[in-house]
Every structure is written in C-alpha cells, then in structure tokens.
C-alpha cells in the first residue's frame, strides 16, 4: 500500500475516483514530458523564460508543483490499493510506470529557487557580457578608423612631398616633329585623347615651373592647347586665339566647353495681361516644370521640361508670355524706362526688348521700335500685337540716320547693336569658322556709328531721362569696351554711369596693350560658364549736355577726366551732326589692306 494509505483509516476510494485520479496523473506526466523534450531555440529565449518564471510566476508555479506532487502521491496510494485487490492490466502497468517516472521528476521539479538558481539582477551577467562585447567591438572599430585616418594622412603627406617635384607629363610632340613611326600631323585624331591632352596642358600651364618639360617654353604649350581646342571644339585658329585671350587658361577651356551646351529655356511674363504667379500656376497645370529665373528678375521663368510645346500653349497665343533669353532682360533693366517717356529702340526685332519696355511703361508714353531689316519687322509687329502693346510705332530706318534724317529728342535710347554673336555660339555653330578679322573690324565700325547716333538722339535736358544703353551679345573687346572708349572720345558730353544690375563682372579697364578709361569698370560682362546665360555686354551712359565741348579730348582722355568736363561757352550745337566720311574711308581702307596681307596678298604701298 502507498505511503499515505498506511497512515489513513476509512473506506477506500471508489473505482471512478481512482480512474479520474489516474487520468489526471497521466495528463500531468505527458505535459511534463513534452516540456522536457521541447528544444530550446536560443540562449536569449531561455534567459527570457527564466526571468519571466522567476519574477512573475515563481510563486504560483511552486504552488502548482506542490499540488501536483500531492496528487501524484494520492494516485500512487490508489494504485497500491488496486494492486492488492486485482491484477494489473497492461495499461495499468503502463500508467504505473509513467506515474513512477513522474514521481521522480516531480520530486526533482520542486526545488528552492534560492538554492539552485540565483536571482539575476535587472542587467544580467549575460547581458553584461553582450554589452562588454559590443563595447569591445566599438573600441576595435574606433581603433581601426583611427588607424585608417592616420594611414590616409600619412599617404596624403607623402603625396604632398611627392608633388613638390612632380613628374612632368609628356603632352607636347617631340622637338623633331616625329614619333617612333610617323609624323604627328598624320596621326589619327582621337577626341578622347585630345580632351585628355587639353586637361594635362591646362594642369601644366597652371603650375608651369614644376610641371613643364625640360627645354620647353610656355608658348609651345599654349600653341598646342590652341591647336587642340580648334580640333576638339571646331573653332578657327583666329577666333580661338581671340576668345582665348579674354580668360585665364582654365577659364578659357570652361568657356569653350560651355559653348557646347544650350542655355536654359526662359520665358518672360507679360505683365500687361497677367502676373507671374498666375502664369506659373496655369503652365504647371498644363504639365510644365518651371521656377522663377532668379531674384534679379521679377518677370522671368525658367522652363525645365514641358509636356506641351511651350511656344504653342493657349497662354502663349493669348500673349501672356514670350520666349526670351534671360540675357535680353538685362539691357531693358539697365535702361529702366519710366511712364510717359519717349523711347527709341534702334534695333528692336524680334520684339522681346521693346515689349518689355512697354510693359514697364504700362502702355504709356511712346516707343519707336525701329529695325533696319524690313523682313524682321514682320515678326516685330506680330509680337507687339500678340502681347497687347499699344504705345509702340514700328519703323524701318537705318539707325545711323537718327536724329538728323528721322527724329531725335528721346528721353532714353536702347541700342542692342548688331554683333558677331560670340556670346551665343551654341545657337549658331557656324560662328566658330565663318568669322574673320575683317568681319570684326566692319562690325566694330558700324557699332561706333550707331552708338554716336544713339547719343545724339537723346535729349540731355529730359527731366526723367537722358540715358543711353549699349549692349551686344558678343564678348570681344573690339565690340564692347573699345566701342565705348571711342564714344567717350568723340562725345565728351556723355559719361558712364552704373547699370544698376545686381550681378555681372566689371568691364575691362585694360586689356593686353590697350588701356581704357577707368569708368569702364561700371560696364558689365556676362559669360555662359559663369552666369549660365548668353555671353553679353551692357553699358549705360548719361548725356550731360546737348553741346559738344571744344576741348583737347586726347589730352583729356590721358587724365581720365573727360566725363566730368565743364561745358564751355564756345560750344557748337548738334543741329547738323555728320560723320567724318573721309576718316571712315581711311579706316575701311586700312582694314582692307590688313586683311589682304593676312591672306598672303602683296599690297602696294600707300601713296602719299
């Protein structure tokens, strides 16, 4: 009989009670066996379960285990009674064995947690080990990074010491003009190799003392660089040299590279019909990606991409905007027209600038929109009507006939003179090869005549005006500073004033062997590689009198004081201003002879 049965008295339990007790013991034994055989997934999971059982359910589990132990003993007693009364079946033997096994397990499972397992603190030893491991890894990584930084610094220092006397790159052809197999001139032109050679030559010229090849001079490198520029970008040697002289070596290459890329597409809001915010919203709704052109303009928008033709939208046809280069805003902004003024635009086609002037005047005053090319006046008239300009008169005269044969007395005159187009080469690639020295001389002469006519057409006594703005889309000195210098000599009754433009480089006051008036620093130059707009030149002059002083202009220019000259009493009115045709013919003849000599023709000596 069982241990408890020996100490008890009374009627033994019924068969049903014995069966229920045995069934409970069997289920408990199976649960314990299943929990014992269940594999542990990981150490972390085991630790978590132990913590949970320790801190949350330790008391309840101990009580449960004790209750199960009592039940097991009671079941064992019943089993002993059954053994005395009737023989055991196979199932009973199995239950008995299971109960005995569970009894041993039960005795082991009831333990004092203080004896066999120490209560772990909130941060256990294992988590501390993990933290120590993480700290060790962080320290190792930090040491590794420090070592790498130290190594990089050491390599940089070694490279710096090496670059003090770097090896000179071989970019020039041999002195004898031959390679190992064939002459340089017969070698195929690989554009990628030419580009690399351009970069190497620029690097050498920027540090010529340390990188030049022995026995080579700077002119050889410059000559090779110009040859490569002509081959790579497609310029004539004459134009490449003319543009190369304007910049440093590095900047010159940047300029040539910028001429291969188009400028951003820009539009100007017509404030006579709409506002920029409203126009931008309307175009965005049509799938146009745009943004304001910059803080310097209140009407310009730059278009990045468009799902519709930007020159055929309903807004365009309604005259809410006009496609206009950002550089064309600048002369009008410098002119700063005021309402109710009489203004002359001497070369106004296709109408971007004249319509901007009308918008600033709010359709007040009067504008003479002149252009010497009759065919271009058609586009001019079309834009004037489309944009709703009502204060403009379109005329077709040679600008040199103002004011004597046409009309004068304007408050302001805008002269966007015809030019070589060296600032907009990306628009017309033919400029690279079809411009000669004779073309520049002819254009420069025409520009000087037009500027003198513009000065003479302005009323110096205007209460609000008396200004002339001269601009070109060229960056050559012959068409820009040289023309202004000529006008200052011929018309001492004008002076240069600030353009009022917020950005742009100052004009040249000296260029190579040429020296210009100090006030030319008030002019502004714009370059595609610097400002991301067309190459442009803008100058603003103020007419201080309608009379031309009879002073020695040549001596006055040496002193640099012709702009502030006092108008003397013995002045002549400009009622019948005429050009010196003899002097013009002489200049033209000199240019013709010079051009013939450059082509290799023998020119007879000039007769006295």
Curated annotation (Swiss-Prot):
EC number(s) recorded for this UniProt protein: 2.1.1.-
Swiss-Prot/TrEMBL catalytic activity: a cytidine in 25S rRNA + S-adenosyl-L-methionine = a 5-methylcytidine in 25S rRNA + S-adenosyl-L-homocysteine + H(+)
Ranges annotated as biased composition (Basic and acidic residues): 16-29
Compartments it resides in: Nucleus; Nucleus, Nucleolus
Cellular-component GO terms for this entry: nucleolus; nucleus
Residues bearing the modification Phosphoserine: 58, 60
UniProt entry keywords in alphabetical sequence: Methyltransferase, Nucleus, Phosphoprotein, Ribosome biogenesis, RNA-binding, S-adenosyl-L-methionine, Transferase
Compositionally biased residues, Acidic residues: 68-116, 147-158
Top EC class, one word: transferase
Xref: InterPro entries: MeTrfase_RsmB-F_NOP2_cat, MeTrfase_RsmB-F_NOP2_dom, Nop2p, RCMT, RCMT_NOP2, RsmB-like_ferredoxin, RsmB/NOL1/NOP2-like_CS, SAM-dependent_MTases_sf
NCBIfam families xrefs: nop2p
Summary of the function given for this chain in its UniProt record: S-adenosyl-L-methionine-dependent methyltransferase that specifically methylates the C(5) position of a cytosine in 25S rRNA. Required for 60S ribosomal subunit synthesis and processing.
Similarity-based family: Belongs to the class I-like SAM-binding methyltransferase superfamily. RsmB/NOP family.
Protein's name in the database: 25S rRNA (cytosine-C(5))-methyltransferase nop2
């Amino acid at each position: 009989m069982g241990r408890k049965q020996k100490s008890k008295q009374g009627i033994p339990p019924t068969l049903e009670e014995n069966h229920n007790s045995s069934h409970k013991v069997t289920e408990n034994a199976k649960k314990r066996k299943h929990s014992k055989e269940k594999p542990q997934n990981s150490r972390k999971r085991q630790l978590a379960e132990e913590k949970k059982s320790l801190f949350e359910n330790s008391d309840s589990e101990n009580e449960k285990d004790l209750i199960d132990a009592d039940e097991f003993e009671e079941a064992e007693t019943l089993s002993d009674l059954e053994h005395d009364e009737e023989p055991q079946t196979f199932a009973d033997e199995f239950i008995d064995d299971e109960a005995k096994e569970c009894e041993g397990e039960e005795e082991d499972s009831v333990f004092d947690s203080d004896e066999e397992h120490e209560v772990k603190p909130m941060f256990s030893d294992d988590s501390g080990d993990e933290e120590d491991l993480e700290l060790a890894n962080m320290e190792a990584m930090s040491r590794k990074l420090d070592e790498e930084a130290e190594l990089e610094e050491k390599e940089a220092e070694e490279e710096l010491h090496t670059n003090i006397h770097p090896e000179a790159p071989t970019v020039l052809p041999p002195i004898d003009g031959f390679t190992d197999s064939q002459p340089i001139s017969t070698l195929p032109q690989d554009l990628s190799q030419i580009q690399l050679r351009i970069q190497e030559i620029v690097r050498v010229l920027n540090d010529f003392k340390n990188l030049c090849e022995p026995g080579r001079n700077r002119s050889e490198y410059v000559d090779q660089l110009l040859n490569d520029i002509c081959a790579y970008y497609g310029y004539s040697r004459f134009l490449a040299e003319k543009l190369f002289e304007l910049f440093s070596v590095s900047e010159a290459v940047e300029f040539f590279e910028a001429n291969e890329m188009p400028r951003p597409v820009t539009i100007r809001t017509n404030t006579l019909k709409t506002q920029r915010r409203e126009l931008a919203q309307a175009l965005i709704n049509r799938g146009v990606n745009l943004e304001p052109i910059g803080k310097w303009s209140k009407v310009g928008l730059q278009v990045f991409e468009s799902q519709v033709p930007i020159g055929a939208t309903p807004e365009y046809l309604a005259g809410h905007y006009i496609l206009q280069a950002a550089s064309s805003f600048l002369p009008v902004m410098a002119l700063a027209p005021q309402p109710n003024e009489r203004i002359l635009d001497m070369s106004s086609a296709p109408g971007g600038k004249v319509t901007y002037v009308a918008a600033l005047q709010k359709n007040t005053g009067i504008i003479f929109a002149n252009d010497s090319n009759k065919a271009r006046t058609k586009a001019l008239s079309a834009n004037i009507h489309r944009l709703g300009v009502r204060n403009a008169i379109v005329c077709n005269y040679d600008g040199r006939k103002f004011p004597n044969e046409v009309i004068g007395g304007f408050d302001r005159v805008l002269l966007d003179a015809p030019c070589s187009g060296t600032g907009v080469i990306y628009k017309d690639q033919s400029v690279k090869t079809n411009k000669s020295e004779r073309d520049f001389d002819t254009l420069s002469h025409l520009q000087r005549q037009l500027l003198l006519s513009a000065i003479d057409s302005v009323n110096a006594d205007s209460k609000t005006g008396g200004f002339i703005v001269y601009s070109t889309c060229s960056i050559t000195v012959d068409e820009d500073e040289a023309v202004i210098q000529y006008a200052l000599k011929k018309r001492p009754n004008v002076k240069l004033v600030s353009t009022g433009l917020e950005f742009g480089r100052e004009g040249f006051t000296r260029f190579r062997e040429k020296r210009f008036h100090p006030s030319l620093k008030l002019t502004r130059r714009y370059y595609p590689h610097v400002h991301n707009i067309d190459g442009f030149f803008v100058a603003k002059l103020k007419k201080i009198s309608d009379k031309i002083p009879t002073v020695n202009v040549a001596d006055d220019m040496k002193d640099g004081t012709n702009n502030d000259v006092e108008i003397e009493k013995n002045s002549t009115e400009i009622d019948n201003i005429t050009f010196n045709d003899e002097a013009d013919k002489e200049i033209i003849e000199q240019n013709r002879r010079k051009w013939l000599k450059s082509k290799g023709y023998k020119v007879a000596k000039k007769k006295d």
